[in-house]
Amino acid sequence: GTYMGIAGQPEITQLVEESDCLLLFGVILSDTNFGVSEKRITPRTAISAHGGAVALGWHRYGRIPLAALVAELNQRVAGRTPQAEGREPRYPQGLVMDEAPVTPGDIARAVNDLFRRSGRMPLAADVGDCLFTALDIENTELVAPGYYATMGFGVPAGLGVQAATGRRPIVLVGDGAFQMTGWELGNCRPPGWDPIVVVF
């Protein structure tokens, strides 16, 4: 699962926040992952590796590339049996057409239903509800920003996905972000791009 503090799945939140030692490999501490923590996660009980350095508690060791660290750790645990088994996530599906207002969960259900009928499509999500909704969508290629300061990312990112891959993307974008960059859709006609844009 994905840790999102009190906004995430309770069992994931409990696992992370009650851990005696967190291993954070390539994790960028931001408002979308640790900003809604109910408990304070302290560097004293974490080993963090990113940006070419490793921090253990309050100590920092530079010039340790993440790829080299992971390769060395994999080599040291080779042949050991994992103590815990993961479980397959259950993504919401089966959208019911009714008179109730549309919620982000309904959007995730609709996209998951579409994927089951037509196959997976790449996904570009903006920040906020769009990003959190994307976490309830079946695993597919996803581009999304990590900070609220990147509002407006979704539409241009979706166009970039189609330009780079030739595949039709789904874009999840909020109404404010759409006002900022939605006009970029005017560039779709000459190259023949056809993203599906869902405005929250």
Regions found by a protein language model. Give the residues of each.
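Thiamine diphosphate
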Residues: 1, 57, 67-70, 132-200
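Glycine-rich, acidic loop regions that bind phosphate or pyrophosphate groups
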Residues: 1-87
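Solvent-exposed alpha-helices and their adjacent loops that cap or buttress functional pockets
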Residues: 13-18, 38-41, 113-117, 136, ...
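Structural motif
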Residues: 21, 122, 168-170
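Short beta-strand segments
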Residues: 24-26, 50, 126, 172-173, ...
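Active-site glycine- and acidic-residue-rich loops that bind
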Residues: 27, 101-106, 177-180
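A short acidic, amphipathic alpha-helical/loop segment
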Residues: 34-37, 110, 184-187
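Active-site diphosphate/adenylate-binding microenvironment
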Residues: 86-166
